[in-house]
Design a protein with these regions (language model features):
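Histidine-acidic metal/acid-base catalytic patches
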Residues: 3-32, 38-47, 121, 179-285
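Active-site acidic/histidine proton-transfer and metal-coordination neighborhood
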Residues: 10-23, 95-197
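Active-site-proximal loop/turn and secondary-structure-junction residues that shape catalytic pockets
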Residues: 37, 56-58, 89-92, 131-133, ...
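N-terminal substrate-binding region of glycoside hydrolase catalytic domains
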Residues: 47-66, 87-93
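Mid-chain, structured segments of secreted extracytoplasmic proteins
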Residues: 72, 78-103
Length: 285
């Protein structure tokens, strides 16, 4: 090896070492970030948020007539950033599990909701709906999981036909009793079929002490993440929570989805400060 080659190799070694240790790639550090508070849309847009994630029940209003949705659609289209994600999914009076599960009503709901979501330009719908999916007392949890998988598998092709990927999210045990961990959520979506995916909610994981390493179980099915700090469900940068244990696992998995801030907003932390704090963590893994 001549001297020039040796010097070139020596100069490259720090970068190669960082890569071997899993240094953050520019692409991962720049993954899209969105907000969930419509009132803050101008601030989101100014701070570089790429999209809004809003609630189906509030914006798509499947239980109301087309003219109501048309007004919402026009207002949403006029906002400075697009609404490309939706969550919430369905009201608690239409149960997806239990002895009174109403799967026909769920399908009727989505046959209104998904075409409307497509008109808005939505690409991902997340099923939270802790009330609708709550396993009733005395009902077998395994049967509830089976029912949940069944209805997800039934409506996922309808979502796909409208250009939408259907996901479920893990919720903590204070909000529901079904799919409260990444592992249980993966079990349900696997049984539901290949058209159902996962939204990993890092806040809910932290509330229930679900380890970051559990995310690896969702490889190939994880397409979206929700983010908030653990104690008060506050925006990143409020208390200073460290999301990097989760972010490292996501990076190592090759995660290429987005991050939605599903959080409250303290006066001390504006959208620009929150996105800067989170981007800093993305860039320093």
């Amino acid at each position: 090896m001549d001297r020039r080659s040796f010097l070139s190799l020596a100069a490259a070694l720090p970068a190669l070492s960082a890569f071997a240790q899993g240094a953050t790639t520019p692409a991962f550090a720049k993954l899209p970030i969105g907000g969930m508070d419509k009132k803050l849309t101008p601030a989101f847009a100014a701070a570089g948020y790429g999209y809004l994630e809003l609630f189906i029940t509030a914006e798509i209003v499947p239980g109301k007539e087309d003219d109501v949705f048309a007004k919402n659609l026009a207002a949403l289209k006029a906002l400075p950033i697009p609404t490309t994600f939706l969550n919430g999914f369905i009201t608690s009076d239409i149960p997806m599990v239990g002895p009174d599960a109403q799967h026909d009503k769920v399908e009727k709901w989505v046959r209104t909701a998904f075409p409307r979501a497509q008109k808005l330009g939505v690409g991902v719908v997340t099923v939270g709906s802790g009330g609708s999916r709550r396993c009733p007392k005395g009902f077998e949890p395994a049967k509830a999981r089976e029912q949940f998988s069944k209805i997800l598998g039934r409506i996922a092709p309808i979502a796909r036909d409208h250009g939408i990927r259907l996901t479920i999210e893990n919720l903590n045990t204070a909000e529901t009793n079904l799919c409260t961990s990444i592992a249980e959520s993966v079990e349900v979506i696997t049984a539901a079929g290949p058209d159902v995916f996962l939204t990993a909610d890092l806040y809910h994981m932290m509330r229930d002490n679900d380890p970051a390493e559990e995310l690896r179980k969702a490889k190939g099915r994880l397409i979206h993440c929700h983010v908030a700090e653990k104690e008060l469900r506050s925006a990143p940068g409020t208390k200073g929570d460290d999301f990097r244990p989760h972010l490292r696992v996501l990076r190592e998995m090759g995660y290429a989805g987005a991050f939605s801030f599903e959080c409250g907003w303290a006066k001390s932390v504006s959208p620009d400060k929150a996105i800067a704090a989170f981007r800093q963590q993305l860039a320093t893994l």
